């Protein structure tokens, strides 16, 4: 598990497979974009000045193991790595995202396979046939207080 707080410069290499949890914002400031293009073939806009203004160079990126059964709580979200079976309940007041890491979940006539995600609404409880290894991400509403 690698936690990269906002304001930290970062990049992904070609072929990287990541499970990214983003904050509830549509703001992205780009220093460089490898000449990528949008859906119209136009190079995506860079935001060098604004990126420098919001950069937090003293922040530390943390890297830890994230083994089965572990839970990590941060200001922005909680993330759990577990095996789900029988029932799955979201006790939070916000929706959670359940992503299947290994295995297959069957629920209410739907199937969710490895690499797929479902949205579990606040206080929703679903019945599950089978079991699967999953990551459950729940955002925290930290900006309203």
Named regions from a protein language model:
Residues 1-3, 106-127:
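Short acidic-glycine-tyrosine-enriched beta hairpin
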Residues 3, 20, 99:
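Conserved beta-strand segments that form the floor/walls of ligand-binding pockets within enzyme
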Residues 4-5, 13-16, 72-77, 93:
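Short gly/pro-enriched beta-turn/loop segments at secondary-structure junctions
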Residues 4-8, 66-68:
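Glycine-rich, charged/polar anion/phosphate-binding loops
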Residues 6-27, 122-144:
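Ligand-binding loop in jelly-roll beta-barrel domains
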Residues 27-87, 91-92:
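C-terminal amphipathic alpha-helical segment
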Residues 84-110, 114:
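Glycine- and acidic-residue-biased ligand/ion/polar-headgroup-sensing regions
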Residues 95-101, 115-121, 134-138:
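Conserved active-site loop/cleft motifs that coordinate metal ions or position small ligands
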């Amino acid at each position: 598990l690698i936690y990269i707080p906002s304001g930290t410069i970062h990049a992904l290499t070609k072929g990287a497979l990541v499970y990214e949890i983003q904050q509830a914002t549509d703001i992205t400031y780009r220093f460089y974009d490898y000449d990528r293009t949008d859906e119209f073939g136009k190079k995506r806009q860079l935001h060098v000045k604004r990126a420098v203004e919001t950069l937090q160079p003293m922040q530390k990126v943390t890297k830890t193991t994230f083994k089965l059964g572990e839970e990590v709580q941060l200001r922005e979200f909680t993330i759990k790595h577990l095996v789900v079976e029988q029932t799955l309940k979201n006790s939070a007041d916000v929706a959670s995202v359940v992503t299947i890491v290994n295995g297959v979940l069957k629920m209410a006539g739907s199937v969710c396979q490895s690499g797929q995600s479902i949205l579990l609404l606040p206080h929703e409880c679903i019945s599950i046939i089978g079991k699967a290894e999953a990551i459950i991400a729940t955002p925290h509403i930290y900006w309203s207080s």
